[in-house]
Amino acid sequence: MSMKFLTGLQDLLGLYETGTAASSPASPIPPTSPSMFATPPHQQSHSSATSVRKKVCQEANSSADDPDSDARIRQCSHTRTVSFPADIGLITGYHDAPSALFHSIENSNRSIDPTEILKYYREACQRRQCAPSVGVEKQIGYFHKSPDTRQELLSLKGERVSHAQMEALEEIFKRVQFNTIDFEYTFLDDDCAISLGEMIEFYDSCVRLNLSFNKQIDVRGWAAMFKSIRNAISLQMLNLRYTNLNDRSIPSLCKLARAQPSASLTCIHLENTQMSGKNLLVLICALKYNTGIRELYLGDNGLQPTDGSHIYQLISSNTCLQLLDLRNNNIGDSGVRHICEGLRNRESIEKSALSAMVLWNNNVTGASMDSLAEALMENTKIETLNIGSNNLGVEGVARLKPALVSNSHLHRLGLQNTGINCEGAIILAECIADNTALLRVDIRDNPIALAGLLALHSAMKMNTSITLLNIDATCVRMSSEKVREYQDEFERYFREIQTYCDRNKDDVLKKLTVTFEDQDHVSEDTEKENKDADNDDKEPENEDGDTTPETSDSDASADQSDSPADKEKSEKSKKENNNNEKRPLMASASTSKVCQKERHQRFVRSSSLTCAETVHDIHDRLREMSGSTHSLDAAMSAATTLSPTMLTATYGSTPGPLDASSNTDSMKTIKKTFTVTSAAPPTLALAEWGSLPALPQASPTSTPVVRKLRRFSVSPSSSVFDVATTSSASTSPIPEVTASPHPIRPSTLAIGIPVTGSVPAGPSSAPMIFVDHHTEAASPDCTNTCEEPTTSREAERKRAEETIRQRRGQKEIKDTCRAVINDLLNYVEYEEKSQVERKASLLLRNAFSRPNPEELLKNLQRAESPLTPRTPVTPSRVLEIAEELEEETDEQVCQSVVRCLVRDVLQTEKNELRSTLDRRRRHNSVRNSPV
């Protein structure tokens, strides 16, 4: 090493001994041969660069064999130079990076041939030794021929797709693009997921991808899939319902959410993916600053009240999320309060874009509605709110009333199955009467009777904005025979509600028509001015300020198609492309205007407020998916012992039968759940229809929520007046007229003289009363079934029970009379009286004085008669009045007398209602007047 260093230093400084340099000859370069540079066979390279280098070395070595090379080298070796041939001689060829056919220029010149695609698909299946899918072959035959328009759907739902079949589908993906690719319930594994992700990324195959009900995809498959989705430029919707997202695969999803710039993904479904607790917190931390996702579905994940704080962080931090779906969880009142705090946060009020929220079936009560009302009054961006399937009751509607009265931005309100009765319907009617923002209200599956229907009917007369009011048709059904003549009248009220909705809808459409006509005239004028001025192809602007690039192209195509030759060409192209439903190349100005009108009219089409499950065979799917239904099978074995017509829907409580008519509503809702006892092993979770994996075991401190599998989607649906036919409450059979201690349900709204020996059958919401009079004890020989008390102790016990029953009956009579009077007030207040009824009431007012209700109660208690059921709405004086008034029927006279009893109270309530409405109108006029 030192010798080499010294030699190099000597060469650098040029220190040579003259005598030595002149006398001592330098060592000659030893002759070399090609064998010296030869490499072993296993190290030989066949590249062109290596062969060139060998050739240069051989030429240099051959020169050393010449006689001149024996001369002494008297200079430093650093003066040598090495040269290489030109670079262009080293490059023998090149190959472009592969690209999909859809990104090339030749794509617009080609046409789609379904026969050719089918041939290539079958050949690919034959090479991979797998059977082609019959459904795929049938769908290929319906492909249209336009290369610039995506096909609508490619569905393999319910088929078992292997890795070989997935690879064979590439022959389709490389030639055709789709709007939706559906791999729901196809038993995909990691290899299938990796191949599918690569094809979606490379070919940009779809806009919406459905991978739900695939439990066999694990960490490796999800990592590759999420990486491909991050690079997909057109994918907008991803459905991952009932998939196996665990702690190891969620970080890959979080990388997708944190990607900057954000991916094209705007909607993601994560129902029943164990997204609660720590997993939810990790996901929300990734979504805080995401600017792409607009819709997030987190239903059926067993969210607890403590998860409400995580939702608070999402609402207060994210600025682009528009829809948050939290259906079928156990958030509770405390969790709702956390969410309301997020809605009231200053940053969310200023920057948040959240406009729709779903809290369906979250064990929420009326106690948290005051917080929700305050949040709605402060946050003016919420347009859709669904709080159905929660036990809100009248208290919840009353607490929500301030927000509904003063709210001017809430468009859709879902109150389905919230325990609203007639009183709650009257409160809601007061809110609807003056509200000008609501477009749809859903109050189905609530025990609303005739009084609530009349209140809603009166409110809809005044309302000018609601285009769809969902209410059960059972509210007009009356079980009593004596009021059967009023059935047609109440059905007319029910139909008029639909008429009022159609009236409001027509008014909105007329306004839209006028707006579009004005806009069309303005756009035509601007086009003429632009053409006359400088022949500029500048598009007119629409109402929203967005330009319509289709206008100039469509006008040009319309002008070019005026000649006969162009018409013939267009007809030929139509015949050739008869399978093409969408033809953007042949669009005209009229079609662009129609599309523009449809886009603007979407706000008329209200969103669906019914959380109905659309998967009818969900149980079979859960049972087939391996490793996911161990507890569900146990639940099914326990449920099969029950009657086929009796389904239970409770957790930890006594199971009760579901109404058989509950499955006959218009949305085909599946209301099926199972009862799992708390004695199950700790390793098995609770199983139910609507969630998998199921909720954790119930603890003494927290009670799991009862969940009916009813799904919610705010996707646009038809605005036709939809009236469900489900019965809100099952009516109990009326007992026979016997001297039994069971209570009798009166007909509170059945006004008429009852037939002797009959009991009016009232609605199930009416209270139970006793008409019990003090009579002598029955004789011992009255019936053979009665047994005499054998001991004095039994006799004393029976007497004590009889005394308690009598006291209880007297109290129930008083409460029932008050309830009857309240029902009569509501009935008479909203009823349109005929001339005959008014005439009878005037005659009775002049002839008789109004009796005191307290005296009627006392007389009813003092009267001694056999134990016979009566209705308190039929006083004994009605018979005398009916005999004196020969011109009127007995039923009309009875109705008039009852109305006379409550006329003073009615007048007071009408005055109060009139003053309240006048005050509100004055307040609105002052508020709306210009300052």
UniProtKB/Swiss-Prot annotation:
Residues 554-563 have a biased composition (Low complexity). LRR repeats lie at residues 232-259, 262-285, 290-314, 323-346, 351-374, 379-407, 409-430, 435-458. Keywords: Leucine-rich repeat, Repeat. InterPro entries: Leu-rich_rpt (IPR001611), LRR_dom_sf (IPR032675), PP1-Reg/Actin-Interact_Protein (IPR051279). Residues 534-547 have a biased composition (Acidic residues). It holds the Pfam family LRR_6. Residues 41-51 have a biased composition (Polar residues). Residues 20-71, 519-602, 780-807 are annotated as: Disordered. Residues 519-533, 564-584, 790-807 have a biased composition (Basic and acidic residues). Belongs to the PPP1R37 family. PANTHER family: LEUCINE-RICH REPEAT, ISOFORM F-RELATED (PTHR24112), PROTEIN PHOSPHATASE 1 REGULATORY SUBUNIT 37 (PTHR24112:SF9). This is Protein phosphatase 1 regulatory subunit 37 homolog.
